[in-house]
Amino acid sequence: VRRVVRLLFCIFLVVTVVGGTVGYQLFTRTHDDPLREVDAIVVLGGEHDGREDYGIELARRGYADHVLISDPYRPYTEQDSMMPRVCSASTPDITVTCFEPHPSTTRGEAMFVQEMARRHDWREVIVVSWSYHLVRARFIFGQCFDGDVVMHAVPRDYSPNPVLWGAVYAYQYGGLGKAAVLGCD
């Protein structure tokens, strides 16, 4: 019994160290691409952490004249003023389109972007999300979107809590596995 417990502990330790080291490289280190002018800016769903305004700001800075904002938050609560505000932020120079992805996942967002790219003859997009989501989002967009993708993290700080990062790594690993199995069909 002790031998089995020791073996299981060693396996757990190796998996934790390897998973943490690889997770750090994949999900904690920056994987931003240099910004360049593209056909559209895509803001993926997630926390209201400034990503929506950041996507619109990138458009104002001239990187694109169309912003797609994923909007899986409907129906809105009375406290949620963010989405109604950003979804009505179009100007004469910038078109903001909010969309509800189906399915309500990164895959659904990438499939919608592919459809919009077909309609509008887009070849390049900037995708804005959390820094730790960029690797998985790049993988999924690579499956679902025929064009070039510039990945860029929303500028923000992240909690240094190792338990939180462990959960983030596990979620991202699971999401990568799911994406590898499901593909984009």
Report the location of each language-model feature:
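Intrinsically disordered, low-complexity sequence elements enriched in Ser/Thr/Gly/Pro
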Residues: 1-4, 49, 136, 176
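Membrane-interface helix-boundary signature
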Residues: 1-5, 161-164
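N-terminal type II signal-anchor transmembrane helix
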Residues: 2-32
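Structural signature of transmembrane alpha-helix termini at the membrane-water interface
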Residues: 21-25, 55, 177-184
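A structural signal for short, hydrophobic/glycine-enriched beta-strand patches
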Residues: 24-169
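A transmembrane-helix-recognition feature enriched in membrane-embedded lipid enzymes
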Residues: 161-185
